[in-house]
C-alpha cells in the first residue's frame, strides 16, 4: 500500500471544486495566514482558561477580603476599651513567671536613691 502523506490526492477539477467550498477557502486562508492556525487557538485557550479559572480567583480574593477587612467604628471602640496598659518590664517578668519575685524586690528597694559618685580629678574628661 502506497502512503501519500496527509495530503489527499485530487484531480484538477476536484481541486477547483474543493477550493470553492468553505473548507477549501479556509484551508487556503490557513496556508497564507499562520495566525489563524497558531495564534487564534492560543489566544482562545488563554481567554477560555481565564474564564474557567475566574471562580477560583474569586474565592482567593474573598478570603483576602475576609482577612484584611476594615474594622468598623463600634469594633474599634470595643477593642480600645478592652485594652490593658502595656509595661515592658512587667510583661517580661510575667512571661518568665517571675512577676511576683520582681514586685517583692521593687517594694523592698523603694527607699533607695540613685546618687552620682564624684570622679577623681585625673578621670575627668578634658575637652
UniProtKB/Swiss-Prot annotation:
It comes from the Eukaryota. The keyword Cell membrane does not apply. Keywords: Membrane, Mitochondrion, Mitochondrion inner membrane, Transit peptide, Transmembrane, Transmembrane helix. It holds the Pfam family COX16. The keyword DNA-binding does not apply. It is found in: Mitochondrion inner membrane. Its main location: mitochondrion. One of its GO terms (biological process) is mitochondrial cytochrome c oxidase assembly. It is a single-pass membrane protein. The chain crosses the membrane at residues 34-53. GO terms for cellular component: mitochondrial inner membrane. Belongs to the COX16 family. Required for the assembly of the mitochondrial respiratory chain complex IV (CIV), also known as cytochrome c oxidase. May participate in merging the COX1 and COX2 assembly lines. PANTHER family: CYTOCHROME C OXIDASE ASSEMBLY PROTEIN COX16 HOMOLOG, MITOCHONDRIAL (PTHR17130:SF14), MITOCHONDRIAL OUTER MEMBRANE PROTEIN 25 (PTHR17130). This is Cytochrome c oxidase assembly protein COX16, mitochondrial. The lineage of its organism: Eukaryota, Fungi, Dikarya, Ascomycota, Saccharomycotina. The gene is COX16.
Amino acid at each position: 500500500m502506497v502512503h501519500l502523506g496527509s495530503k489527499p490526492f485530487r484531480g484538477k477539477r476536484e481541486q477547483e471544486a474543493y477550493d470553492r467550498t468553505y473548507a477549501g477557502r479556509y484551508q487556503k486562508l490557513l496556508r497564507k495566514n499562520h495566525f489563524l492556525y497558531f495564534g487564534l487557538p492560543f489566544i482562545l485557550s488563554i481567554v477560555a482558561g481565564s474564564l474557567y479559572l475566574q471562580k477560583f480567583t474569586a474565592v482567593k480574593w474573598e478570603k483576602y477580603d475576609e482577612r484584611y477587612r476594615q474594622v468598623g467604628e463600634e469594633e474599634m471602640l470595643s477593642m480600645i476599651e478592652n485594652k490593658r496598659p502595656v509595661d515592658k518590664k512587667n510583661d517580661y517578668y510575667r512571661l518568665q513567671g517571675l512577676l511576683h519575685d520582681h514586685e517583692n524586690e521593687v517594694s523592698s528597694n523603694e527607699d533607695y536613691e540613685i546618687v552620682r559618685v564624684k570622679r577623681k580629678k585625673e578621670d575627668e574628661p578634658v575637652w
